[in-house]
């Protein structure tokens, strides 16, 4: 039997680090008037359910009625004065908000605002179960509603509208740079590690490195098992989200802190200053690395505590996420192109299945990935599996809303990044300069551009692997075919092509086999 493989915290986090699409929620403005003054508030609504005008001038003025003291789950909850032509404010809970909307509509209400006690989350649910619901449904925070009552009094009228967004947002450029930079640097770093392995002076060093890396190498069988576990984890998250989301947050904190340490420690080791050490249990530890570990833990803890602070917590999440992706691309190894094809192919099917097929299976007709992205059961916690960048272009009036963001799943970086890392290692093994590495990196960039183009045209979140996998696999295959190295590239072997490096090493450290003497 082969060595038993253990799954590290980083590997466990990778199981759920694949694309989660945006839901159909959209920010809108609630323009409230009362006591001779006006104020704007943020609300979330589903544009596929109800359309809103794009300007304040075209919005209709509606009188607001506070029904937060009643659950509005039965017709008897409607007050005697009625709610006809009103925008009613109801509390979250007791029954489904779509049931509340149906009752409000029967009472003649024109709109329903659901007050949530925590941060806003997108309205989601199976609209097909309530096809008769036509009124506007929107969500506002309890904090905003309380401020509205204190500032504007009891006699409030509201206008609701949703300013149109430009088709292109420069946030796409930022995400593009982050993604390409991460896969390129991770692949290059993996190549440097491979070069160090091949230049190991002694056979013992090589064997020690080889055994160490066996735990981090994905064989074809391991790849299949990995994808199966991914599917199981996705289903478990779907049914037990409200508990498992905190497990995933904890895993991300541990894995990202370790990854950030590994990335920064690699840089610090290149600095020839401040190398003082202290002895602890017979081992010498550099003081600067001790401080570094404390810093990395502190960054992860601060993010965990303030993860819902949308104004700035995204910066920490992106830093931790980039480090997490870099470390996995450098550490995890696909031994050959065959494993790359199996992994990327299966994860492409995984992505398509959970985005496009699961709506035909789930009871509410929603994609499992979309449900997890929104937070099932109205859960305000989100899985930290994405790079988040606030939109750089948005109207000043939208500043009252939670900062709108564009996202890219970790899986859209890590999965193609593992292929690019293999290409770089193959370059090192064969001495083929950077041809495979550069070609696959350029192909990844083209795939990202294609993803953004489709995103703009379709105006809907896209499973990026649908475009990244074909671009990278086809490009790598064409390069290997043109260089007549397909067989070698397909089978791969981290230790099969070391003759030229052995010769170079032996010239510096000549060792004569047999009965001859090692030169001193």
Curated annotation (Swiss-Prot):
SMART domains: PSN (SM00730). Gene3D superfamilies: 3.50.30.30. Residues 63-151 form the PA domain. It is an enzyme of class 3 (hydrolase). Residues 26-172, 242-247, 307-311, 362-399, 459-460 are lumenal. The chain crosses the membrane at residues 173-193, 221-241, 248-268, 286-306, 312-332, 341-361, 400-420, 438-458, 461-481. Glycosylated. It comes from the Eukaryota. One of its GO terms (biological process) is regulation of tumor necrosis factor-mediated signaling pathway. Belongs to the peptidase A22B family. Interacts with ITM2B. This is Signal peptide peptidase-like 2A. It comes from Homo sapiens (Human).
């Amino acid at each position: 039997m082969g060595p038993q493989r253990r799954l590290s915290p980083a590997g466990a986090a990778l199981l759920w680090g694949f694309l989660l699409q945006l839901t159909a929620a959209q920010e809108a403005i609630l323009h409230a008037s009362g006591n001779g003054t006006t104020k704007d508030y943020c609300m979330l609504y589903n544009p596929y359910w109800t359309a809103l005008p794009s300007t304040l001038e075209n919005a209709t003025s509606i009188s607001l009625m506070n029904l937060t003291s009643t659950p509005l789950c039965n017709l008897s909850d409607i007050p005697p004065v009625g709610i006809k032509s009103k925008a009613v404010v109801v509390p979250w809970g007791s029954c489904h908000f779509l049931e509340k909307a149906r009752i409000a509509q029967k009472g003649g209400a024109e709109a329903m605002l659901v007050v949530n006690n925590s941060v806003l989350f997108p309205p989601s649910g199976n609209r097909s179960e309530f096809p008769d619901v036509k009124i506007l449904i929107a969500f506002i925070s309890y904090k905003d509603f309380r401020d509205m009552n204190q500032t504007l009094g009891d006699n409030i009228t509201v206008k609701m509208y949703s300013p149109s967004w430009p088709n292109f947002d420069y946030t796409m450029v930022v995400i593009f740079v982050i993604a390409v930079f991460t896969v390129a640097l991770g692949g290059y770093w993996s190549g440097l590690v491979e070069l160090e392995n091949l230049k190991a002076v002694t056979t013992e060093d090589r064997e020690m490195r080889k055994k160490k890396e066996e735990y981090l190498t994905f064989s074809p069988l391991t790849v299949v098992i990995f994808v199966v576990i991914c599917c199981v984890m996705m289903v478990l998250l779907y049914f037990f989200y409200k508990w498992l989301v905190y497990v995933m947050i904890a895993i991300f904190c541990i894995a990202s802190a370790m990854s950030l340490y590994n990335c920064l420690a690699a840089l610090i080791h290149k600095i020839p200053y401040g190398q003082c050490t202290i002895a602890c249990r017979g081992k010498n530890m550099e003081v600067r690395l001790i401080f570094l570990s404390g810093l990395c833990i502190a960054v992860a803890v601060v993010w965990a505590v303030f993860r819902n602070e949308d104004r700035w917590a995204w910066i920490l999440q992106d830093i931790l996420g980039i480090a997490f992706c870099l470390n996995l691309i450098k550490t995890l190894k696909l031994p050959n192109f065959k494993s790359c094809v199996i992994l990327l192919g299966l994860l492409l099917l995984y992505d398509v299945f959970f985005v496009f097929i699961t709506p035909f299976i789930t009871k509410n007709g929603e994609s499992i990935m979309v449900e997890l992205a929104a937070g099932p059961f109205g859960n305000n916690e989100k899985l930290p599996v994405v790079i988040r960048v606030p939109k750089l272009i948005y109207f000043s009036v939208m500043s009252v809303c939670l900062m709108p963001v564009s996202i890219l799943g970790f899986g859209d970086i890590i999965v193609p990044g593992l292929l690019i890392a293999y290409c770089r290692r193959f370059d090192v093994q064969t001495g083929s300069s950077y041809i495979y590495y550069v070609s696959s990196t350029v192909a990844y960039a083209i795939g990202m551009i294609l993803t953004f183009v489709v995103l703009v045209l379709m105006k809907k979140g896209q499973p990026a692997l649908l475009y990244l996998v074909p671009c990278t696999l086809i490009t790598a295959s064409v390069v290997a075919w043109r260089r007549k190295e397909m067989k070698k590239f397909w089978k791969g072997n981290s230790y099969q092509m070391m003759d030229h490096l052995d010769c170079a090493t032996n010239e510096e450290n000549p060792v004569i086999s047999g009965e001859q003497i090692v030169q001193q």
